[in-house]
Amino acid sequence: ALTSLNLNGKELLATPLTLSLYRPATDNDNRDKNGARLWRDAGLDCLTQKVVSLRESKTSTTARVEILNAKTQRVGIADFVYSLDRNGALKVHTTFQPDTTIVKSMARLGLTFRVSNAYDQVSYLGRGDNETYIDRNQSGKIGVYQTTPERMFHYYVAPQSTGNRTDVRWVKLADTSGEGIFVESDRAFQFSIIPFSDVLLEKARHINELERDGLLTVHLDAEQAGVGTATCGPGVLPQYLVPLKKQSFEFTLYPVK
């Protein structure tokens, strides 16, 4: 996993950049036949990485990694290629092959990391300025928006995933001086940045149980399942599920000042 992204001696990452396949369940996810039960059965809510091979060249580093659940079952294989150019841009190319004997459904396919809550100035080009998911985003108009993690987070009575944005071209996370991280991709992606950890969001039963730890949680998703209407109607339609097949995606991260 990528453990450091540095700008003039200042560390930008609070946690490593890792693969993410799960989201804290929404009310709909808990009732959907393709939702949270299948994700938890596969152990996607508690993943670790085991390096199988590592190759380095003058321009890049390639890592093959087994993605394991808490039972040490392999849920898939990921290949990460990290390339750094002379301007400080870090390209992270990821290929993931799920093991479909274990994995029957995925909430998302992307990368996640945490940063200091100082990086709370968020701007992006994508659908906004409200929350959007792949199966409910027509109300979001594509444009450049400025927001904060606090504004992106919706305080549901029962804490759950929230704050997603779709059809994103780029996103910038910065502190009040303008220093931070700029992210872009070679295709439209989804992202969220919220003021709580996924672990806490999953564990908390009520709003008053949400406690801040000084960090923000960032998700950069090549794919994320829709939310459906399973609490009162149909679940997520097939075309809005994450495909269970080998997929590749790429994000480029730039330290900015």
What is the meaning of each model-derived region?
Residues 1-257:
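Beta-strand/loop-rich accessory regions of lumenal/periplasmic or secreted enzymes
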